[in-house]
């Protein structure tokens, strides 16, 4: 198991739990790999306690060469855009008054080829804001307009992280559109909301996780480079969304165990999942501070001397916007005769809240992490 992948998973789980605390009954969605990449780039320019703090929060203790690790992951993940409607934008914008050191520029050039940009917040704020908004809009094929709200930057901004991630999935097996029906989605024990429910009968990898009374299923996207794992409680058992048990027991070891192929077996499954689109703009600053990332945001305590000789430089803001669309779309559903080994039919009906991850199977990195609680 790759040390960077373990580190990224641990950070993904920490961050997910933080966001769940903030949104106990709402939908949660973020892109851990985008956040990790941007913060790891900031770490290259940080020194002393600031660098150590980033390393601790991102669980880099056992990772030998962080920038090289991200270079490999980024180049692997970037190849996916030729198969999928997937865009992962991770930018670190630095004000030009910082006069970045040549050493910092050269050490980040290869591992973070497109991630670092020098801009002018100080003297040309409105123009710079417009440029960033337009560039993110272009890079996401027009999906994200005006990613920077009026108050997100000022002429005092020194370093800004902007993440924008969107994915419109195409399944390995297409859901027949004629089978999509409006059904009640149970947001808790007593209330329901209507949702368009997609249905298919096919062979999938599925398992039971008894410790959390849950089913898990792997749904591969076309070409199997990415998979969506759904963790679905057997029922809504608590007084909230039914996800309390999962959220409580979730840690990176548990997640690795739950998504391990040995937990699951091929089975013929009658599957029902909601058709949905979730768009979230999150402000991860408070969550990151709760996880121990405190110095980086304060001009009095942050140390970015590996990047610039300017004193009092801090990370001003982290903008993180994600959009995920799950539809019927996919390849032709052809059942392989050999896959009919298990004849008994399992059922997975996601008509109540569930946790999901979208994982890059080659590097096992989590691209998206979310919970779906309400249509």
Curated annotation (Swiss-Prot):
Protein family per UniProt: Belongs to the serpin family. Ov-serpin subfamily.
Organism: Plecturocebus moloch
Source species, domain of life: Eukaryota
UniProt name for this protein: Serpin B5
Entry's localization field: Secreted, Extracellular space
One Gene Ontology cellular component: extracellular space
Annotated site, Reactive bond homolog, chain positions: 340-341
Ranges in a coiled coil: none
Matching PROSITE patterns: SERPIN
């Amino acid at each position: 198991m790759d040390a960077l992948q373990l580190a990224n998973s641990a950070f993904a789980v920490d961050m997910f739990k933080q966001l769940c605390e903030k949104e106990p009954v709402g939908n949660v969605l973020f892109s851990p790999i985008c956040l990790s990449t941007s913060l790891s780039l900031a770490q290259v320019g940080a020194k002393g306690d600031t660098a150590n703090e980033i390393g601790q929060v991102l669980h880099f203790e056992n990772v030998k060469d962080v920038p090289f690790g991200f270079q490999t992951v980024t180049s692997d993940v970037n190849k996916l855009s030729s198969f999928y409607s997937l865009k992962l934008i991770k930018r670190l914008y630095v004000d030009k008054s910082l006069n970045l050191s040549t050493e910092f520029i050269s050490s980040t050039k290869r591992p973070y080829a497109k991630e670092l940009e020098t801009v002018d917040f100080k003297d040309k704020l409105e123009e710079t804001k417009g440029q960033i908004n337009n560039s993110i809009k272009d890079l996401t094929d027009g999906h994200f307009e005006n990613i920077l709200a009026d108050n997100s930057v000022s002429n005092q901004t020194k370093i800004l992280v902007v993440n924008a991630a969107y994915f419109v999935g195409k399944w390995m097996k297409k859901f027949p559109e004629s089978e999509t029906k409006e059904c009640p989605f149970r947001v808790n024990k007593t209330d329901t909301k209507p949702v368009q429910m997609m249905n298919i009968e096919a062979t999938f990898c599925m398992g039971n996780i008894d410790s959390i009374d849950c089913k898990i299923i792997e749904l591969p996207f076309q070409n199997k480079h990415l998979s969506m794992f759904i963790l679905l409680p057997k029922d809504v058992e608590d007084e909230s969304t039914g996800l309390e048990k999962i959220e409580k027991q979730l840690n990176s070891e548990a997640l690795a165990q739950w998504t391990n192929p040995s937990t699951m077996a091929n089975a013929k499954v009658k599957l029902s999942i909601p058709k949905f689109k979730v768009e979230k703009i999150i402000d991860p600053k408070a969550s990151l501070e709760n996880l121990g990332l405190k110095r980086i945001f304060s001009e009095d305590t942050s140390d970015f001397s590996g990047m610039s000789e300017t004193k009092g430089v801090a990370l001003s803001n982290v903008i993180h916007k994600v959009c995920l669309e799950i539809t019927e779309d996919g390849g032709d559903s052809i059942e392989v005769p050999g896959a009919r080994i298990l004849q008994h039919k399992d059922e997975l009906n996601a008509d109540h809240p569930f946790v999901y991850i979208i994982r890059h199977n080659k590097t096992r990195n989590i691209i998206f992490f979310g919970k779906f609680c309400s249509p």
